[in-house]
């Protein structure tokens, strides 16, 4: 089983969007039994809060099903238990190092390093642009799935 943890600052915008987009892609390809997909935060600011209304609206617009979700913070145990820890931006990478320590197993990646882009996924909490965030996540999720198909 391939275990993927998507990570952003608060776990209410980008990482839950990535979680539910990837779950839909996996389900559409009948691979649900081969993947475990979750999301978490690097900060404690939003712990317990639900998905941001803009993320919900974008997922709904794109017919991406989502379930009840409450923000959680990533832990050292998550590092041990997941194959991929996928951060949305450079600040998330730095905060992940602070939380889980050195990435000896090369599990931690920035989302867009799976593409030809070397930029961060813009945070719609600040930009208000959930469309750009969705496009980045959707493209990379398909790319990541194709790399792991058997």
Predicted regions and their residues:
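Conserved small/polar residues in nucleotide/adenosyl-binding loops
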Residues: 143-150
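Residue-level recognition of oxygen-bearing side chains
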Residues: 17, 91, 150
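Glycine/proline-rich loop-helix segments at beta-alpha junctions forming the active-site rim
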Residues: 72-131
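Conserved active-site segments centered on acidic
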Residues: 1-80
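A non-catalytic, amphipathic alpha-helix used as a structural packing/dimerization or gating element
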Residues: 132-142
């Amino acid at each position: 089983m391939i275990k993927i943890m998507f990570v952003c600052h608060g776990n209410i915008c980008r990482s839950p969007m990535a979680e539910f987009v990837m779950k839909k892609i996996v389900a559409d390809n009948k691979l649900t039994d081969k993947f475990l997909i979750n999301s978490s935060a690097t900060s404690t600011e939003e712990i317990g809060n639900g998905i941001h209304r803009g993320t919900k609206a974008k997922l709904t617009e794109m017919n991406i099903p989502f379930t009840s979700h409450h923000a959680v913070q990533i832990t050292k145990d998550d590092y041990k238990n997941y194959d991929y820890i996928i951060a949305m931006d450079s600040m998330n990478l730095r905060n992940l190092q602070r939380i889980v320590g050195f990435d000896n197993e090369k599990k931690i990646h920035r989302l867009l390093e799976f593409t030809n882009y070397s930029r961060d996924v813009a945070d719609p909490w600040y930009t208000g642009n959930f469309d750009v965030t969705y496009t980045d996540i959707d493209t990379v999720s398909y790319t990541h799935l194709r790399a792991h198909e058997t």
